[in-house]
Amino acid sequence: MTTSSYFLLVTLGLLLYVCRSSFGTEHTCESDASPHPQGVCGSPLAEAVEAACELEEYLQGGTGKKRGRASPLRKRRAFLSMLKARAKRNEASPLQRSGRGIVCECCKNHCNIEELTEYCPPVTEGSG
């Protein structure tokens, strides 16, 4: 094996190791796991998602993009009410994403703003 082939093999191995170790930090939790000390649960979690979605929408710069809502304020309140009601009943199934849910990611673990915005409704083109 030549030196360049060996170097390439070692480099690919290191790259694979780095990728695997960084992607292995996804939040997972058991059903009986207790909330994280810095986790956000219940109604505050629903409010945090709403705030994160509004911030993301604001940062997109008012380019005529909307979150598919006919009446933004009414739909936002309905969405928040639904989240609060489900949080009180401890049902997060509509918020599941790839086998993990928002309760697992942000209540039983600590999540950041990027993770919160992953639960926002999709942005669609529309008129103001």
From Swiss-Prot:
Expressed by the venom gland. InterPro entries: Insulin-like, Insulin-like_sf, Insulin-rel_pep, Insulin_CS, Insulin_family. Residues 1-24 form the signal peptide. It is found in: Secreted. It comes from the Eukaryota. Disulfide bonds join C29-C104, C41-C107, C53-C120, C106-C111. One of its GO terms (molecular function) is hormone activity. Its main location: secreted. One of its GO terms (biological process) is glucose metabolic process. Keywords: Amidation, Carbohydrate metabolism, Cleavage on pair of basic residues, Disulfide bond, Gamma-carboxyglutamic acid, Glucose metabolism, Hormone, Secreted, Signal, Toxin. SUPFAM superfamilies: Insulin-like (SSF56994). This venom insulin facilitates prey capture by rapidly inducing hypoglycemic shock. Intraperitoneal injection of this peptide into zebrafish lowers blood glucose with the same potency than human insulin. In vivo, when applied to water, this peptide reduces overall locomotor activity of zebrafish larvae, observed as a significant decrease in the percentage of time spent swimming and movement frequency. This is Con-Ins F1. It comes from Conus floridulus (Cone snail). The lineage of its organism: Eukaryota, Metazoa, Spiralia, Lophotrochozoa, Mollusca.
